[in-house]
Amino acid sequence: MKRLAIILVLFIGGLAAEGQQLPLFSQYLYNKFLINPGVAGSDGYTSFSLSAREQWIGYSGAPRTFSFSGQTRILKRGYRLKTNTGGGNVYRPKTDGRIGLGGYIFSDKNGLVQRTGFQASYSYHLWIESSTQLSMGLAVTGYHFKINENEISFEDPNEPWLNNELRRGVFVPDADFGIFVLNPKYSIGFSSQQLFGAAAKVGNEAYRNFSMDRHYYLFGSYSFEPTSRSEIQPSALLMMSEQMKPQADIGLTYVYGQKFWAGLSYRTSKAIIANFGFTYTNMYIGYAFDFTLQEIQRVTYGTHELTVAVRFGDSARKYRWLDRY
């Protein structure tokens, strides 16, 4: 029973270190869709993003996460009838479309636990002012949990706690919801993930059910333009779950010429995050380094995160195409 308790702690700890059961990325500012399904298609582009995160490099069994995401706006092209100054009618091109689609898959290994998951989202976009868009999104999700039993040694190879479900892997369906407000100057978003709090079977008898916690994210950013070619963007992200005390990221990013950016943020779970990146034609590359202020820093080389993304669509369409409704 003692051995059973220890391994259950390892398993559940891998699922929910400090209550965080979902992968956490430091570059969410550049792919808000990962934390809010309402973001899908909000800027009118079609984009794809690949991220890799190595946490606590040098520490055995540390989390390692990979994700691939994509999103798009379903656009319709047509013509709008307008009256010109001479009293005649003219047809002018317009771009329409209120529906966004998105999805992502991820793989996350944390100690003995291997997790894979997916999300498929649908979003709807409305105008509340001439340049302010309100988006709402709903997503279906699924998570697959599996113990890597090759890394576990038992005195009894038929250890009863490792039930057939864990040997094959456990699939947990769920859903996410998000609201997102976008303006050329600011963005605000609220989302909830794992809405249903589904239960995963993690063992036999009294240890069969482990509930997935509902997670909440509140995000906001604002853009100042001290010059015509530069922006300063303060941002904040508040994260909460039913088992995790609130955690916040507070950051500041400098953008030059819409081509280069560099930022610094502080995470209240005792970490400092530096990030920078650049764009080239329709591609952007970003890198983040997390320096933890906790004791584990003595045995690690920090956390590294790399993101590569590609975006399709007319560059002049951002914000401008939105005026064509």
Model-assigned labels for residue ranges:
Residues L4-G13:
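Sec-dependent N-terminal signal peptides
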Residues G13-G14, G189:
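Small side chains
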Residues L15-G19:
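Sec/Tat signal peptide C-region and signal peptidase I cleavage site
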Residues Q20-Y325:
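Subset of outer-membrane beta-barrel
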